[in-house]
Amino acid sequence: MVLIAVLWIVMALSIIVTGLSRSVRDEAKMLSMARQGAQASALGDAAIQLVLQQMAVDAKPVDRMTTVQVPYQGRQMDVQVMPLNGLVDLNSAKTPLLARLLTVAGGLPESAAEPLAQAIVDYRERRTAQGAPRRFEASEDLMRVPGVNYDLYARLSGLVTADIRSGGAVNPLAAPSAVLQVLAGGNAQLAQQIDSQRQSGQAGVDMTGLDATLIGSGTVRRYRLQARVPVPDGGSFLVTRYVDINPRSRDGLPWTTFHMQREVEPALRPSP
């Protein structure tokens, strides 16, 4: 009986030791990931600041999506600069553009997309107590429109903005590939072709396949800058700043950041 009791005690102690060892390993891994995230965030912010400084020196508005390679402290990072008129402006987009967005990107049938697009227009045009149109203050406000649930918003969130006044049209040179697909009526091959021509720096990009009633040109002073910082596990850490390139005497900088976000882009794992 004594021997059996000793064996049970030894087994219990080994289980406790194993659990403690696993807990220590997990905590060490979490600390390592937190340290990597903090370092990647600082590197991404530094790369964005360098690109912003160059944009301020050039004093020339960027009219198309472009990617800048930034070497910093022995790391090579890509910073994507996107003028916000490459997104669908919730406060000025016409009903046909919103309906196309809901159909192509949102996955809704046309019979549901058209009335929902009109509901979005009705929401932003509704008058406040002061008599001004209510308008969308942030893209998240889209979920206040009846019929827009979180799943639909998640499919649209990266394609819309409430931070500019674009006149209702989209600049295809600045548009992400998913927005190009909306402008192309769902033609993914055409959107990819235009995106490839644009990324190659081609001067005259053929836009004839896009719906001419939905596109426009021009420049804005608001941009999304996104730095991609590679991390040791093969993934990337994305640092994003939404900025207004205008002098501000309050802080002395020639730009103002009005939104920031950070996220992890996991490494692609081969399928088993």
What spans do the regions from the language model cover?
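Compositionally biased linear targeting/interaction segments
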Residues: M1-P272
